[in-house]
Amino acid sequence: MHSRQRIVHGVLILALLGTFAGLTSCELFPPPTPTTPPSPIDFARVLDYAQRSALVYDSDEVIRQKASPGATVTISPATPTGVKAYVETNDANKVQWVVVRGTSNLANVKLDVDYNKVVDPRLQVPLHKGFAEAALVVYHFVKTLLKPGYETRVTGHSLGGAAAVIVLMLLKEDGVTLGPAMTFGQPKVTNRQGAAKYRSLPLLRFVNDKDPVPLMPPLDLFSLLDEGPFQHFGPEVVLGNGTMYQYYPEHQAERFSVTSFWQTLGQQEIPDHPIARYIQSLQQKIGH
């Protein structure tokens, strides 16, 4: 953006700050009302996805040992930033899985937050630059392994979930047969334009009630004036204690302030964010 435009935008931001002073994000953007899901959520099936999202954090040997019987598993080498993926192919039922692990360093969510407007000529939507770069590495790894006509299921946790969503977008453009995709504790990857274009994807996002990572990156007034703020797409299931959960047909507004959390991201523990905590919550939903 040119410096003069930035100055004008800066003046507008000051005006907006004056207008919105004292208002919370929930007051600016009223949260949607939880609804009944179109069909009952099969938490046993969701747990299957979450366990794969956990497995990708293990060693290659453990991944192969714990893969489904009769499945073929191909594992990517980890990148210097820790991004890794594996493809699990089951020829008997013609199902293939793409499981993505992102970097374990949450501070990387803050890196390269600028939108990259042309990540791939097929997408043409703004994306979080860091997530897009990770997703492209995974995409180039998996695209030669996927078998035509097989149902393709995509999953990932945290930053791996963010990369998994972008991989899902790319696979849609390839005409791949997509099965249900599920992510856990996934941060935002695109803006309103991207959300509108890809909201028909078979994506279901799971969020622990006190996990702030899915609220990242937070609302920023500069982004309101540029490409627009980061925004989720796909229904959201907020996991509460015990058997409690709420279903939202779209992302709900921020449940709590994340400004201070964003400033110290990567420097503190987040008890509700680890994949083990998601698995524990899902097990409670099915009585384990």
Task: Give residue ranges: language-model regions.
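Bacterial N-terminal signal peptides
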Residues: V11-G22
